């Protein structure tokens, strides 16, 4: 089909669609498809009458024909919009009258969308290698349309918008002549001028050719019509594009963008000249572009062949997608000065129109004001009606409609055009993508939306030179750009192929598979709510959903524009497998890819309910020390025991997310179902959003058979076990890999280890990879958790909602290191009997059902067995063994393993009359085989035995454990003991299938082989089993049993034991499964049916089984013993094998084609000896049987017929004693290196009660004695351990059983009668159970501990009380001292105030905190600045306080002078107005501060006065009297001290002597006491002086003092008293602090003894000493040079304030002056 036909079809389809749209909608957007010459009669504008309602005619040119026709049609149509309608010509029909209405509205926008007159332009590159994103560019187009609409409504602009002209994705609005059509915001000229200029232009051809050159050179520039303020010289991002010159950037506020100087002329040549030079020469001026069409293409693609020029030309001008989007917002702000609401709509595209089906169309919808909202709803109805016609793409078309930002009607109609052609592929194009013209036969470049997700997704490094095979390349098969349509042959001549190509080109999951498309479509509904993220304006929103696969388009796509290059990609299945792949052509070695599992995925939404798809992602880093990369396999190789670490880092908007410290709120569409597309296509809401409480990373491993495949049909079934090493003790415990919480955007797992290895690791050819090689890939998934109890302890069942997943490169995991794969098995190192030339074969290991892993054998020739579910085994067989079983032999080592097909080999028991019980075993390839596993055997005279069988199962790590039938008779005892010690085996079921009549003849063995798994899990050390091909050397066994015949005959009881075994097990065949416990349990044997107590007891019962002779039973038992004793060292003899062909044929009919079944029956004949035959001939008399029974009754030791290492007896065992009374009696010491165990499980106990008895009392009542114990017969050696050499007693220490029985009755038992060595007999000997004593001792210890704890608590409490008492005592002392100190300080302050006559209260004595008058000058200086000068003289004061105040005055003076000078110099007229108020304000502030501190001082003094009053009321009642008396006495003394003091002193002494002689009869001490100059202060409480004489003296002295006080008060003046007191008491506070307080501290708290001693000493004082002390104090006080009051005591035992604490007050005993 040629291009004309193509355009014609497109035109017809679009016209029909426009009719439907007009019928269903009131849309303002008209779709015009300019036809070619063959279609000139076709109407261009259809049903434009509906557009009159919205007054907006936007002519969108889609898929326009070649250049010349389009230019003419463009010109004609533009004239029709701006001029009255004329007669329609042949080329273009007349425009309906609604176009005139459009002219009245003065808003005529012609948008050229993806037109063909220009070829596509390659994407420009930024420096980081990332291509420019079409997301913001498309948004720019929408914003520009919106801006133009609003500006047109206001400014009468007619705009011709060229969008995606060069397919670069960057929107451009180009104006005719760059300024003629476009008017500035301030310009309100009519359209006539614009139309006339347009009509007067040199034709549309000249317009286009001249303007397109400029367009080519400025394609990526965001040029906004009507307002060019955005391009103020330089854009915000610098030189945004590769084609923009300086002239364009220098268009500052110029309407004429094409000119270089801002003039309005049509200087297209200058513009293109500079731009082309900048484009071609990296900034230098070059030659202008030619106007010819061919030269346009040549110049356009001149630098395509040299992509490095882009990078070099713009090495500093990286274009940021986000900044471009911001620039567009700036465009909106510049152009829509009066349309702020519409700008808000552009910013919130996802929030304002959630109910509309085309939320991404908000930009254009806003162009048409409120009517566009109605159009949105109608558009969705139109899409539905079209969907009815195209049932194959109903919902997909609707989804396309939702994401068509530019033109809702146009896009939905275009979808319907291609709806039938490509079915579900219609999801991929909302508007058809336009290819270059027909002269370029090259594939189309990726569409604008194919990179729309780069903005919303993190940047990914893309190499420009990546090959199509790269996983990062859109052409890579792994990216699935086209699903089933991965072809890049651009079919310009085929309508369907053209659009189908773009569909497959742009999207990843747009297959013809409805399921895939449904997932994409539903994501479209979710993604369509956020146009900024998806920005799928011209294409379907699937690009937003599949942004991970469409992020990057390397430079290799540039070759798609070449005429020669044609790329064809195929699916991954059709690519031939390369034997050796070039690593650099595939992908990075540790590059984690995006993974899309088959499970449901969810979307995150921000706090504003806008979708966050693409705004975040995460990267994964794996760390491993011993990992290597294989170039041949294109995979990493490591070993299973290797440990590695995986780190996950969130990037983007969730980079700093932490579960416990969430900075923002996000939501997840928890209830949105991606599979129900038919119901959700018309619903654009976000589903039921739930708040995300946390983010978690989860990790699991998948297995793949193809290294290039990352898709798993069911990843749940393809998962591989992985565990994490660690544990509470730091050991290598295998822990479950738990989800990793996101902390600061990070998650981590360390010490990870694979639970199994990959299969088919061996290479078929050394230089070629194994085609069946299995690969492991680690999958990391980011999950959202919406559990409300996330931060609580109830967070047990989190709800994980997967968001994104990453998958690792392929890995090959080997089971062992290469050095460990030797010819000999590791188990040979443990077995001392093994050797390279013989011995036991290596034990096989493996997994799977029905005996998987039971491989191996005896001897040297290796054979292996495997199971249908992955079991395998390696071992060695006997050299001389004749093998009749054709079992698959393979060496399944990890590094040398060939690809094999799963084979099942089954060996079962054959019977003449089988009634099989079938079991189904499923292989990895879902191959099943039905085989009989348990067949009852008929009763025959020859007894046979079918050994217990073990079934192997597969655990989580592909470890082989027994879970199926196998022959225990072919297992050596050492191996079988190892099997029983394996917890994996003991944890599974052991089946016993033994018939009462068939004891040894049949050997039932089931073994399966699987060659797919490697020898990964080395459990062969413990699972040393033999190959079923290996047979027993029966002749050797018969020889050896003849050697033991004599011993066997003496033990005929064994025959009865065998019969008892058969009978007991036959009774238990209905429940043959018993579960054994861990081998670490010392009582494990109790639960084993082979060692059951009932079986042991039945071994020695005298039972005669009818039908079976005694000789037969003996022979059977001998054979059994011989088998078990000789399997370890078999010899080469003839092998007897019987193959039951009938049963073999019966099982072959039931098997699958890949399953083989073989039945083997080994018959062991009995060879009776002569002694046995004689017994048989005699018929076995009853007397013989009775003698045998009597002999076997006292048989000492027996061997377990099933476990050779077990010996037992039913008799009592005595060690160093001949008469044991218990099961084990030991006479002597017991040395135990292990542990002694006793059953103590709660599950076997009942009636459990806590023993609350007084254990301590019981233990305390027990008494320990030293005694001599008499020796007992059979227990004690008569020659040892005696007190003497021949003594019959033994020295011991212990309890007496009788006393113990009274205290602990349950600790004493009766042992029976005991005979002593001295000949006496003790009946009912009492023995003591030491365990009971031990338990009582433990209880007593616990009781003591509880008592000690109580005592400890009591001691702590007492200690706390003692500390409290000490603290309270210290507090009391502190209170007393504080009171006295306050009293002394207050007394001194009161006297100071009186002496100063309250000078402090006067304002002249204004002092800040008592500093003096200098601070007064400082304060007054704020009101009178000259005071600062006066106060500055205090700098010369030697006093520190005054010097500081003087310094402050000086500083204030300097500052004032400087401020005054500056203000006068600069603002002399305002200097006074500023300085004067400032000084006054500062002065008031200083006054307030001074007043505040002064008030504080007054408050403190007031507080002290109040406190002294309280002190007086609380013990200091006479304090004021004492103080006043002291002052009067001191003043009187000072007044008379200077007048003949000695005379008066002598006279007073004489008078006192006379008075004393008269009153006291010879006491000479009254002379000094009666001295008038002596002033004594009365003592209120003279407890320390009990002498009556001294009391009288003190009373007389008090009377004299009172009388003298009255006289002195009348004589003295107040002023003289104040002066004298001030001089004398200036240093009193020092004495109060230094001397009295120290003595008071020493005397406080001393009671009793100190009082009594002080009283005795006081009574011994003589009055002469008292008078002498008073006189000495008086002399010192009268010293004129040292006028001070010395407060001293008359001796060391009488302090100044000797306070004797009383309940009410504190009394001063004496104060001496």
Swiss-Prot record:
Locations listed in the record: Membrane
Region span, Disordered: 1-35, 79-200, 226-290, 309-557, 713-734, 808-952, 1143-1190, 1596-1634, 1646-1665
Record field: transmembrane: 1416-1436, 1447-1467, 1473-1493
BP term (GO), one: positive regulation of DNA-templated transcription
Gene Ontology MF term list: DNA-binding transcription factor activity; sequence-specific DNA binding
Biased composition, class Low complexity, residue ranges: 13-35, 79-109, 126-170, 177-200, 226-264, 317-470, 478-489, 505-553, 898-946, 1148-1189, 1596-1605
Membrane topology: Multi-pass membrane protein
PANTHER family reported in the protein's UniProt record: NDT80 DOMAIN-CONTAINING PROTEIN (PTHR13029:SF19), PTHR13029
Name recorded for this polypeptide: Uncharacterized membrane protein DDB_G0293934
Source organism: Dictyostelium discoideum (Social amoeba)
């Amino acid at each position: 089909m040629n291009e004309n036909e193509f355009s014609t079809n497109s035109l017809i389809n679009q016209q029909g669609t426009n009719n439907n749209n007009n019928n269903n909608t009131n849309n303002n957007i008209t779709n015009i498809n300019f036809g070619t010459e063959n279609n000139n009669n076709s109407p261009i504008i259809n049903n434009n009458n509906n557009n009159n309602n919205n007054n907006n005619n936007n002519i969108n040119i889609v898929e326009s024909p070649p250049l010349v026709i389009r230019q003419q049609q463009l010109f004609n149509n533009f004239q029709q919009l701006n001029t009255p309608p004329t007669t329609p010509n042949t080329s273009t029909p007349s425009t309906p009258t609604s176009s005139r209405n459009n002219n009245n509205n003065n808003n005529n926008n012609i948008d050229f969308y993806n037109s063909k007159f220009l070829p596509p332009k390659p994407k420009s590159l930024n420096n980081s290698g990332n291509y420019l994103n079409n997301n913001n560019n498309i948004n720019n187009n929408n914003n520009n349309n919106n801006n133009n609409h609003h500006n047109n409504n206001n400014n009468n602009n007619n705009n011709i918008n060229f969008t995606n002209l060069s397919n670069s994705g960057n929107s451009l609005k180009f104006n005719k002549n760059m300024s003629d059509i476009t008017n500035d915001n301030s310009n309100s000229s009519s359209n006539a001028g614009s139309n006339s200029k347009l009509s007067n232009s040199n034709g549309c051809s000249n317009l286009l050719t001249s303007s397109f050159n400029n367009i080519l050179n400025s394609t990526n520039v965001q040029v906004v019509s009507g307002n060019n303020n955005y391009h103020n010289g330089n854009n915000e991002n610098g030189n945004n594009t590769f084609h923009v010159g300086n002239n364009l950037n220098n268009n500052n506020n110029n309407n004429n963008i094409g000119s270089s100087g801002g003039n309005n002329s049509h200087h297209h040549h200058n513009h293109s000249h500079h731009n082309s030079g900048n484009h071609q020469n990296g900034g230098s001026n070059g030659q202008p572009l030619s106007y010819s069409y061919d030269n346009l293409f040549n110049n356009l693609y001149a630098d395509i062949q040299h992509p490095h020029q882009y990078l070099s030309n713009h090495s500093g001008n990286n274009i940021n997608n986000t900044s471009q989007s911001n620039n567009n917002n700036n465009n909106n702000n510049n152009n829509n000065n009066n349309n702020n609401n519409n700008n808000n709509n552009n910013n919130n595209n996802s929030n304002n129109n959630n109910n509309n089906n085309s939320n991404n169309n908000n930009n254009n919808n806003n162009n048409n004001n409120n009517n566009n909202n109605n159009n949105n709803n109608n558009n969705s109805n139109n899409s539905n009606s079209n969907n009815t016609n195209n049932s194959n793409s109903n919902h997909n078309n609707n989804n396309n409609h939702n994401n068509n930002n530019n033109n809702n009607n146009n896009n939905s109609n275009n979808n319907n055009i291609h709806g039938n052609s490509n079915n579900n592929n219609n999801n991929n194009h909302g508007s058809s993508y336009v290819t270059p013209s027909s002269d370029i036969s090259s594939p189309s470049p990726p569409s604008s939306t194919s990179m729309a997700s780069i903005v919303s997704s993190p940047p990914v490094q893309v190499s420009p030179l990546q090959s199509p095979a790269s996983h990062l390349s859109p052409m890579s098969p792994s990216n699935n750009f086209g699903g089933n349509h991965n072809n890049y042959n651009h079919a310009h001549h085929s309508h369907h192929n053209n659009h189908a190509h773009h569909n497959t080109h742009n999207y990843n999951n747009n297959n013809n598979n409805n399921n895939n498309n449904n997932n994409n479509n539903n994501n479209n509904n979710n993604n369509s709510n956020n146009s900024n993220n998806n920005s799928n304006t011209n294409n379907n929103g699937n690009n937003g959903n599949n942004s991970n696969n469409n992020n990057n388009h390397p430079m290799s796509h540039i070759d798609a524009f070449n005429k020669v290059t044609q790329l064809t990609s195929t699916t991954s299945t059709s690519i031939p497998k390369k034997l050796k792949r070039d690593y650099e052509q595939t992908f990075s070695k540790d590059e984690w890819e995006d993974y899309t599992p088959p499970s449901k995925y969810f979307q995150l939404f921000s706090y504003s309910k806008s979708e966050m798809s693409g705004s975040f992602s995460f990267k994964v880093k794996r760390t491993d020390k011993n990992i290597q990369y294989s170039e041949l396999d294109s995979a990493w190789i490591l070993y299973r025991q290797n440990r590695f670490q995986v780190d996950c880092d969130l990037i983007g908007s969730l980079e700093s997310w932490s579960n416990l410290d969430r900075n923002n709120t996000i939501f997840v569409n928890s209830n949105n179902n991606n599979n129900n597309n038919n119901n959700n296509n018309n619903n654009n809401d976000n589903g039921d959003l739930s708040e995300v409480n946390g983010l978690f990373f989860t990790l699991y491993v998948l297995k793949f058979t193809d290294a290039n495949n990352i898709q798993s049909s069911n990843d749940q079934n393809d998962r591989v076990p992985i565990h994490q090493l660690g544990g509470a003790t730091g050991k290598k415990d295998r822990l479950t890999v738990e989800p990793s919480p996101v902390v600061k955007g990070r998650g981590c797992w360390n010490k990870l280890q694979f639970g199994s290895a990959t299969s088919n690791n061996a290479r078929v050819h050394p230089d070629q990879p194994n085609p069946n090689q299995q690969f492991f890939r680690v999958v990391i998934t980011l999950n959202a958790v919406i559990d409300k109890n996330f931060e609580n302890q109830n967070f047990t069942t989190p709800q994980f909602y997967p968001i994104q997943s990453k998958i690792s490169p392929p890995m090959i995991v080997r089971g062992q290191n290469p050095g460990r794969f030797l010819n000999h098995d590791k188990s040979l190192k443990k077995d001392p009997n093994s050797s390279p030339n013989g011995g036991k074969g290596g034990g096989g290991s493996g997994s799977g059902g029905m005996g998987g892993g039971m491989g191996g054998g005896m001897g040297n020739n290796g054979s292996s067995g495997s199971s249908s579910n992955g079991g395998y085994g390696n071992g060695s067989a006997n050299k001389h063994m004749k093998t009749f079983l054709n079992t698959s032999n393979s060496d399944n080592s990890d590094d040398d393993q060939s690809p094999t097909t799963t084979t099942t080999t089954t060996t079962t028991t054959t019977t003449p009359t089988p009634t099989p019980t079938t079991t189904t075993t499923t292989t990895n390839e879902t191959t099943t085989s039905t085989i009989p596993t348990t067949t009852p055997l008929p009763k025959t005279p020859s007894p046979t035995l079918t050994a217990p069988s073990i079934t192997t199962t597969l655990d989580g790590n592909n470890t082989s454990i027994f879970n199926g039938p196998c022959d225990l008779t072919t297992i050596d005892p050492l191996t079988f003991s190892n099997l029983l010690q394996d917890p994996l085996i003991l944890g599974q079921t052991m089946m016993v299938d033994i018939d009462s009549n068939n004891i040894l003849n049949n050997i039932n063995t089931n073994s399966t082989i699987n060659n797919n798994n490697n020898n990964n899990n080395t459990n062969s050390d413990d699972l040393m089993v033999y190959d079923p091909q290996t047979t027993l050397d029966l002749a050797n066994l018969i020889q050896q049993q003849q050697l033991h015949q004599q011993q066997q005959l003496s033990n005929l009881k064994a025959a009865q034991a065998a019969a008892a075994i058969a009978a007991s097990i036959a009774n238990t065949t209905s429940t043959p499964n018993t579960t054994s416990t861990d081998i670490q349990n010392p009582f494990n044997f109790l639960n084993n049916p082979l060692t059951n107590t009932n079986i042991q007891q039945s071994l020695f019962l005298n039972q005669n089984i009818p039908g079976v002779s005694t000789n037969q039973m003996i022979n059977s038992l001998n054979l059994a013993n011989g088998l078990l004793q000789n399997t370890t060292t078999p010899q080469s003899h003839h092998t007897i094998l019987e193959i039951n062909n009938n049963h073999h044929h019966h099982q072959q009919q039931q098997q699958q084609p890949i399953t083989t079944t073989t039945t083997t029956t080994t018959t062991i004949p009995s060879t009776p000896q002569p002694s046995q035959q004689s017994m048989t001939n005699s018929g076995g008399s009853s007397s013989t049987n009775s003698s045998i029974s009597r002999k076997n009754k006292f048989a000492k030791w027996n061997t377990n017929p099933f476990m050779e290492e077990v010996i037992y007896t039913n008799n009592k065992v005595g060690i160093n004693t001949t008469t044991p009374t218990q099961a084990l009696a030991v006479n002597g010491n017991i040395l135990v290196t292990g542990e002694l165990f006793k059953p103590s499980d709660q599950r076997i106990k009942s009636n459990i009660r806590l023993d609350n008895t007084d254990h301590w009392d019981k233990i305390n009542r027990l008494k320990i004695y030293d005694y001599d114990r008499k020796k007992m017969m059979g227990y004690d050696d008569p020659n040892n351990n005696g007190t003497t050499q021949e003594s019959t007693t033994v020295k011991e220490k212990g309890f007496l059983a009788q006393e113990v029985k009274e205290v602990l009755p349950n600790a004493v038992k009766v042992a029976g009668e005991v005979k002593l060595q001295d000949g006496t007999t003790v009946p009912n000997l009492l023995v003591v159970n030491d365990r009971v004593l031990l338990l009582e001792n433990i209880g007593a210890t616990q009781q003591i501990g509880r008592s000690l704890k109580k005592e400890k608590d009591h001691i702590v409490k007492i200690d706390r009380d003692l500390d409290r008492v000490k603290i309270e005592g210290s507090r009391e002392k502190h209170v007393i001292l504080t009171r006295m100190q306050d009293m002394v300080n207050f007394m001194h302050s009161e006297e100071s105030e009186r002496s100063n006559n309250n000078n402090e209260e006067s304002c002249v004595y204004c002092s800040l905190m008592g500093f003096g008058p200098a601070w007064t000058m400082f304060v007054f200086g704020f009101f009178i600045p000259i005071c600062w000068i006066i106060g500055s003289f205090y700098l010369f004061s030697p006093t520190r306080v005054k010097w500081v105040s003087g310094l402050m005055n000086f500083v204030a003076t300097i500052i004032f002078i400087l401020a005054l000078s500056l203000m006068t110099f600069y603002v002399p007229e305002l200097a006074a107005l500023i300085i004067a108020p400032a000084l006054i304000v500062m002065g008031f502030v200083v006054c307030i501060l001074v007043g505040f501190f002064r008030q504080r001082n007054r408050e403190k003094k007031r507080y002290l006065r109040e406190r002294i009053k309280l002190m007086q009321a609380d013990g200091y009642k006479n304090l004021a009297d004492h103080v006043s008396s002291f002052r009067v006495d001191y003043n009187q003394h000072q007044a008379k001290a200077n007048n003949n003091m000695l005379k008066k002193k002598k006279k007073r002494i004489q008078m006192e002597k006379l008075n004393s002689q008269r009153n006291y009869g010879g006491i000479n001490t009254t002379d000094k006491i009666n001295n008038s100059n002596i002033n004594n202060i009365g003592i209120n409480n003279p407890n320390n002086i009990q002498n009556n004489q001294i009391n009288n003296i003190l009373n007389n002295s008090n009377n004299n003092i009172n009388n003298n006080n009255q006289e002195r008060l009348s004589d003295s003046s107040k002023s003289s008293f104040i002066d004298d007191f001030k001089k004398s008491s200036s240093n009193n506070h020092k004495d109060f602090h230094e001397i009295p307080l120290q003595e008071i501290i020493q005397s406080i708290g001393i009671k009793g003894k100190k009082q009594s001693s002080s009283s005795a000493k006081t009574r011994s004082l003589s009055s002469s000493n008292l008078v002498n002390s008073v006189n000495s104090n008086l002399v010192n006080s009268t010293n004129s040079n040292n006028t001070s009051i010395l407060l001293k005591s008359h001796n060391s035992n009488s302090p100044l304030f000797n306070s004797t604490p009383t309940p009410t007050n504190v009394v001063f005993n004496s104060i001496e002056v």
